Regions:
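Conserved alpha-helical segments that form or flank metal/cofactor-binding pockets of metalloenzymes
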Residues: 37-74
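Disorder-to-helix initiation segments
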Residues: 1-13, 92
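Helix-loop segments that flank and shape redox-cofactor active sites
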Residues: 1-5, 20-45, 109-116
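Acidic/histidine-rich alpha-helical segments that form the ligand environment
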Residues: 59, 79-116
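Generic structural signal for well-ordered, non-transmembrane alpha-helical segments
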Residues: 11, 15-18, 44, 48-55, ...
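Short, charge-patterned binding micro-sites
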Residues: 34-38, 76-83
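Intrinsically disordered regulatory regions flanking bHLH/HLH domains
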Residues: 3-4, 64-67, 73, 82-86
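Heptad-repeat coiled-coil alpha-helices
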Residues: 26, 30-33, 63, 70, ...
Length: 116
């Protein structure tokens, strides 16, 4: 199969970018505290950027004759980014740290994609 490793990494990105988008949404919805007014609109920017990347990656995968994941089940079954339940037991700083971890993972995955 042509570009098999590239397609694999791109599809992993599809699953993980989808998961990251949901984590950003969750952070956006469950945010509270003194930095709310600054951070809440920033989450909108993060969501837009992740959604844009997801679209570009999916279209690139299609251009390579690949099949991007396109169901919630496929995303959930294939993501490597851990999710949290939607509850109020996490603080905003904890949620932001979770975002940072997700972005670091994505950075490594993009680098891996460049190398294959």
């Amino acid at each position: 199969m042509k570009y098999a490793k590239t397609k694999e990494v791109l599809n992993q990105l599809v699953a993980d970018l989808s998961q990251m988008s949901m984590i950003i949404h969750q952070t956006h919805w469950y945010m509270r505290g003194p930095n709310f007014l600054k951070l809440h609109p920033l989450m909108d920017e993060f969501m837009e950027e992740i959604d844009s990347q997801l679209d570009v990656i999916s279209e690139r995968l299609i251009a390579l004759d690949g099949n991007p994941y396109s169901t919630l089940k496929e995303m959930a079954d294939n993501t490597k980014i851990k999710d949290w339940p939607g509850t109020w037991d996490k603080t905003t700083p904890e949620r932001l740290a979770h975002l940072v971890d997700g972005y670091r993972y994505l950075e490594d995955l993009y680098q891996h994609g460049i190398e294959v």
